[in-house]
C-alpha cells in the first residue's frame, strides 16, 4: 500500500513539464499546466536562488505543484511544493530535512534496483525512465520501452508514478495507456513549432492531474 514517509501527492500528477527557466514556468502555468519542475543544472545555489524564488512564487499564485530539481536547500528555505532528486543525489541529500520541512519528494529510477532504492526512501512519487531515447541529457542506461514501463507501473500499482524520457506528442497516448499516472516532457513542448498547441494537446492526453 502507498504509504510515503514524505507528504503525499495526487495519484495522477498529469502532464509534468520539466523546464530550465522561470519564463517557461510562467508560460506553462498560464497555459493550464499544474505540475512542473524547474531543472537548472550545474550552477551554484547563489546563482539560481532568484530563479527558484520566482518559480516558487509563480507556483503559489497558480496553486500548482512546482518541484525544484536538486537544489533542496533552496527548496526548503523558500518552501517549495516539492523536490525532485536523481539517484546520484540521494546519498548527498539530507532527506530528513526535506521531510521535516513538509516538502514532497520525487525520485528518479532507471531499473528495478533503483526502484528498490527509491522505495526505501518512501518518497511522494517515483519517476520511471528513460522510456525512449532522449537528447535532453546523457543517459548511462538503455531506454526501457513501453513493455518495461508497464511492468514497473504494475509493480508500483499503489504508488504515484511519472514516466520520463523521449516522450513525444505522438508517443504520449501509448505511455499513458500503461497506467502510469503522469508523463514528464521536455522537448515535446520546449522544441515544438507551436508550444501552446503542443501543451494543449498533451494536456488532453495526460490531464492536469488529480486535485
Swiss-Prot record:
Annotated cofactor note: Binds 1 Mg(2+) ion per subunit.
The keyword Magnesium is annotated on this UniProt entry: yes
Binding site for 2-[(2R,5Z)-2-carboxy-4-methylthiazol-5(2H)-ylidene]ethyl phosphate: 134-136, 166, 186-187
MF (Gene Ontology): magnesium ion binding; thiamine-phosphate diphosphorylase activity
Catalytic activity: 2-[(2R,5Z)-2-carboxy-4-methylthiazol-5(2H)-ylidene]ethyl phosphate + 4-amino-2-methyl-5-(diphosphooxymethyl)pyrimidine + 2 H(+) = thiamine phosphate + CO2 + diphosphate; 2-(2-carboxy-4-methylthiazol-5-yl)ethyl phosphate + 4-amino-2-methyl-5-(diphosphooxymethyl)pyrimidine + 2 H(+) = thiamine phosphate + CO2 + diphosphate; 4-methyl-5-(2-phosphooxyethyl)-thiazole + 4-amino-2-methyl-5-(diphosphooxymethyl)pyrimidine + H(+) = thiamine phosphate + diphosphate
Pathway connected to this protein: Cofactor biosynthesis; thiamine diphosphate biosynthesis; thiamine phosphate from 4-amino-2-methyl-5-diphosphomethylpyrimidine and 4-methyl-5-(2-phosphoethyl)-thiazole: step 1/1
Top-tier EC class: transferase
InterPro entries xref list: Aldolase_TIM (IPR013785), ThiamineP_synth_sf (IPR036206), ThiamineP_synth_TenI (IPR022998), TMP_synthase (IPR034291)
Positions with a binding annotation for 4-amino-2-methyl-5-(diphosphooxymethyl)pyrimidine: 37-41, 69, 108, 137
GO annotation terms (biological process): thiamine biosynthetic process; thiamine diphosphate biosynthetic process
EC code: 2.5.1.3
Cofactor dependence: Mg(2+)
One cellular component (GO) term of this entry: cytoplasm
Binding site for Mg(2+): 70, 89
Keywords: Magnesium, Metal-binding, Thiamine biosynthesis, Transferase
Role according to the record: Condenses 4-methyl-5-(beta-hydroxyethyl)thiazole monophosphate (THZ-P) and 2-methyl-4-amino-5-hydroxymethyl pyrimidine pyrophosphate (HMP-PP) to form thiamine monophosphate (TMP).
Family according to the record: Belongs to the thiamine-phosphate synthase family.
The protein's name in its UniProt record: Thiamine-phosphate synthase
Naturally occurring in which organism (per UniProt): Escherichia coli O1:K1 / APEC
Lineage: Bacteria, Pseudomonadati, Pseudomonadota, Gammaproteobacteria, Enterobacterales
